[in-house]
Amino acid sequence: MAKLKYLLIHCTATKAGREVTAAEIRRWHTSPPPVGRGWKQVGYTDLFHLDGSVERLVRNNEDDNVDSWEITNGAAGFNSVSRHVVYAGGLAADGKTPQDTRTAAQKEALRKYVLDFHERHPQVMIVGHHQLNKAKACPSFDVPAWLESIGIKQ
């Protein structure tokens, strides 16, 4: 068990308007290669669907610790001290160019989720995946600027 230090925001790196299911994410992450990554656990705690609904992928006890059964594989080197959330989207229609494709419903759901999370865990840094791995464009939007726009200063 480790202290929770980060909430990482991710995108699924799928085209704008393409819904993603929990089953797809499980297949991408837990199926053996070459179909998936062969991980024991999916990479995200919660999935933000296009309609703004939020689906829990990995249960957790919502405290300030990351227990072994709560660890998700969203960012190498940070998983034991992080929770990871993901929105469906993140790529332009060409399927290659990073783009903030969040729907209005996803933006509102993520805003509510992050504000609630920050209220319960004010010591936790909320970051985009690319802030911890510069090789990534994920989540395809400027998380620090967005946090400031919703009233969170870190």
Positions of PLM-derived features:
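Short, conserved "active-site rim" segments that organize catalytic pockets and cofactor/ligand binding
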Residues: M1-D67
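Basic/polar, cationic surfaces and motifs that engage anionic cell-wall
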Residues: M1-T12, L50-V54, V58-N60, A76-R83, ...
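Surface-exposed beta-strand edges and their flanking turn/coil or helix-capping segments
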Residues: T21-E24, W69-T72, D100, F141
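Generic structural signal for short, flexible, solvent-exposed coil/loop and linker residues
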Residues: V35-R37, G43, T72-G74, L115, ...
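Short, flexible coil/turn micro-motifs enriched in small/turn-prone residues
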Residues: L47, W69-T72, Q123
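Short amphipathic alpha-helices and their capping/turn segments at secondary-structure boundaries
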Residues: D63, S68-G77
